[in-house]
UniProtKB/Swiss-Prot annotation:
Keywords: Ribonucleoprotein, Ribosomal protein, RNA-binding, rRNA-binding. It comes from the Bacteria. PANTHER family: MITOCHONDRIAL RIBOSOMAL PROTEIN L24. This is Large ribosomal subunit protein uL24. Belongs to the universal ribosomal protein uL24 family. InterPro entries: KOW, Rib_uL2_dom2, Ribosomal_uL24, Ribosomal_uL24_CS, Ribosomal_uL24_KOW, Translation_prot_SH3-like_sf. Disulfide bonds: none annotated. The gene is rplX. GO terms for cellular component: ribonucleoprotein complex; ribosome. It comes from Legionella pneumophila (strain Paris).
Length: 109
């Protein structure tokens, strides 16, 4: 089980977007794409075969390494470490993630 999943709220702790809080749009190997974070300008060449592609300069999110982001705890309003523990429900134990500062569970059971 990975510490950061798609849909988690994270804070950028290093880089040009340091301090930015946003949702994880997708996870790619050891990199994450954060909504509104690490924006780059991409130059698009016009393509006459595709009328929707007019070309120009667009801003989009670039991936960040997972070591440069941390989970954002909405209760403490700070970056937080994530731990794993097993919870039992209906006789089946399930591995869940939780915030280490206040033991609040991140995953839904």
């Amino acid at each position: 089980m990975k510490r950061i999943k798609s849909g988690d709220e994270v804070i950028v702790i290093a880089g040009k977007s340091k301090g930015h809080i946003g949702k994880v749009l997708r996870v790619v190997d050891d990199a994450v794409v954060v909504e509104g974070g690490n924006l780059i300008k991409k130059h698009i060449k016009p393509n006459p075969q595709k009328p929707e592609n007019k070309g120009g300069i667009i801003a989009r999110e670039a991936p960040l390494h997972v070591s440069n982001v941390a989970h954002y705890n909405p209760v403490t309003k700070k970056a937080d470490k994530v731990g794993f523990k097993y919870l039992e429900s209906n006789g089946v134990s399930k591995k869940v993630r939780y915030y280490k500062s206040n033991n609040e569970i991140i995953d839904r059971i």
